[in-house]
């Protein structure tokens, strides 16, 4: 049962960890157009730090969401980085796209004039070593003056955050919007690993987070594929004598059921709360929620393109064995269309589906952690419905009911997998078995 309360403490905003290392390229949802005077300032178009599209002026500088978030996190932390190159990784006069270097990115934020005094931070954050240095620089204080933070606090240039529900909800939705851009980039990227790289779900959970591979590998060339390149989706078949088994894997054609589940697992690994769970509870939770999150993701991706069927990014359709199997694969599409789900609602609903404390066999400690996370995202969804829908509470209830559809859908898919797919998989050589799929479907 999901309960929605009207208060969330600022300290409870346990947001995706992906935000600390990457920049956002896509603009936030813009407000509804209103009457605008001709003297209205023009919105900046280019981030002065990384050169991507700017979302506005942040800390006195035209910048994107990613650079704003990066500068703030660096300011309130004690971490420091050194450039491993020549110190010019973010010099856009020497290159069109900056290199991935946190030291140079931080220095560029400072050099273009990002102002730490424009931040709202509490006294704990203001005591961080980076913030002290930047405040000293901004105020041009003497190096031996150790009272700069106190002076700034006394001058009320640092204030405690306003206890506003709207600002807290906005923080949550901004983070999820940014994370989703990374998830979609990963899904459409040229990164296409062989399933043999992963010995199983447990190995995948304990290995590095791969969401950033979307930026590293770039988009898959040649997508969408031509119809004659696609062919019907099918399970890998035992190779003919003398034929190399690697021929089952194509560099530009993905095994989408495997890759979509891989994407969902990497999505889960970006959440800070997830790393507070034990290895055992991570495995238990992921085995139960991965398929439901995947179904919601691919269903929403399809209806966002005005499609009533599941179409993957390369233009292919998912593998189905019969009408019952097909019906199970598209079960969640109609409810999403019926409730006219918005992007923010989808993002919050997916986070709620991920945070399921009712999964059997979870430890009491993990149930408590996950329950608090679910309430946080449920609160955000409820508040969003109230602010953006005339029928806010009924619409919220309709969205929450989709979770039951997703549960029934994944239960049917797992039963059909056991009936139709598992017998075929049992006949395959071990190196052709996608262990990540089997670990999730056999639960």
UniProtKB/Swiss-Prot annotation:
- Alphabetic keyword roster: DNA-binding, Metal-binding, Nucleus, Receptor, Transcription, Transcription regulation, Zinc, Zinc-finger
List zinc finger spans: NR C4-type: 47-67, 83-104
Source organism per entry reads Caenorhabditis elegans
Q: Subcellular localization, per the record?
A: Nucleus
Which regions of the protein are recorded as binding DNA?
A: 44-121
**One example GO MF annotation:** RNA polymerase II cis-regulatory region sequence-specific DNA binding
Please tell me whether the keyword Zinc is annotated for this protein: yes
Q: What happens when the gene is disrupted?
A: RNAi-mediated knockdown results in arrest at the two-fold stage of embryogenesis in the majority of embryos. These embryos have incomplete ventral closure and morphological defects including elongation defects, and either absent or irregularly placed seam cells in the head and tail regions. Surviving larvae also exhibit morphological defects and contain vacuoles.
Instruction: Specify residue ranges for compositional bias: Low complexity.
Output: 1-20
Keyword Metal-binding in record = yes
For bias type Pro residues, the affected ranges are 233-242
Q: Name one Pfam family in it.
A: zf-C4
User: Into which family does the record put it?
Assistant: Belongs to the nuclear hormone receptor family.
User: Record's PROSITE patterns?
Assistant: NR_LBD, NUCLEAR_REC_DBD_1, NUCLEAR_REC_DBD_2
Entry protein name: Nuclear hormone receptor family member nhr-60
List GO BP terms, alphabetically.
cell differentiation; regulation of transcription by RNA polymerase II
Described function: Orphan nuclear receptor (Potential). Required for embryonic and larval morphogenesis and probably for seam cell positioning and migration.
* Matching SUPFAM superfamilies: Glucocorticoid receptor-like (DNA-binding domain), Nuclear receptor ligand-binding domain
């Amino acid at each position: 049962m999901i309960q929605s309360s009207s208060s969330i403490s600022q300290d409870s905003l346990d947001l995706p960890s992906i935000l600390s290392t990457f920049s956002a390229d896509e603009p936030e949802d813009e407000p509804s157009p209103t009457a605008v005077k001709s003297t209205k300032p023009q919105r900046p178009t280019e981030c002065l730090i990384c050169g991507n599209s700017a979302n506005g002026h942040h800390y006195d500088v035209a910048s994107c969401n990613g650079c704003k978030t990066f500068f703030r996190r660096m300011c309130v932390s004690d971490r420091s980085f050194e450039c491993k190159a020549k110190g010019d990784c973010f010099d856009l006069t020497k290159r069109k796209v900056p290199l991935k270097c946190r030291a140079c990115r931080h220095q560029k934020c400072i050099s273009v004039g990002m102002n730490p005094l424009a931040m709202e931070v509490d006294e704990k954050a203001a005591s961080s070593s980076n913030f002290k240095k930047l405040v000293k620089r901004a105020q041009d204080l003497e190096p031996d003056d150790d009272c700069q933070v106190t002076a700034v606090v006394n001058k009320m240039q640092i204030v405690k955050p306003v206890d506003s529900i709207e600002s807290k909800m906005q923080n949550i939705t901004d983070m999820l919007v940014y994370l989703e851009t990374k998830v979609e980039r990963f899904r459409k990227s040229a990164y296409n690993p062989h399933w043999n790289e992963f010995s199983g779900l447990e190995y995948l959970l304990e290995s590095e987070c791969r969401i950033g591979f979307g930026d590293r590998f770039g988009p898959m060339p040649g997508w969408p594929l031509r119809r004659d390149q696609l062919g019907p989706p099918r399970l890998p078949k035992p190779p003919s004598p003398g034929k190399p088994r690697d021929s089952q894997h194509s560099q530009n054609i993905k095994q989408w059921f495997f890759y979509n589940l891989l994407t969902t697992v990497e999505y889960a690994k970006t959440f800070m709360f997830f790393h507070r769970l034990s290895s055992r509870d991570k495995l238990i939770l992921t085995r139960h929620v991965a398929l439901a999150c995947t179904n919601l993701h691919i269903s929403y991706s399809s209806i966002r393109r005005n499609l009533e069927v599941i179409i993957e990014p390369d233009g292919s359709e998912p593998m189905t064995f019969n009408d019952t199997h097909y019906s199970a694969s598209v079960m969640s599409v109609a409810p999403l269309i019926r409730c006219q789900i918005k992007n923010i609602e989808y993002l919050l609903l997916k986070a709620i589906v991920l945070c399921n404390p009712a999964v059997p066999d979870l430890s009491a400690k993990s149930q408590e952690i996950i329950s608090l996370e679910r309430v946080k995202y449920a609160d955000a969804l409820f508040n969003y419905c109230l602010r953006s829908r005339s029928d806010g509470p009924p619409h919220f209830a309709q969205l929450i009911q989709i979770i039951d559809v997703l549960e029934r859908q994944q239960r049917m898919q797992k039963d059909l997998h056991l009936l139709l797919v598992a017998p075929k998989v049992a006949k395959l050589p071990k190196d052709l078995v996608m262990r990540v799929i089997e670990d999730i479907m056999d639960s």
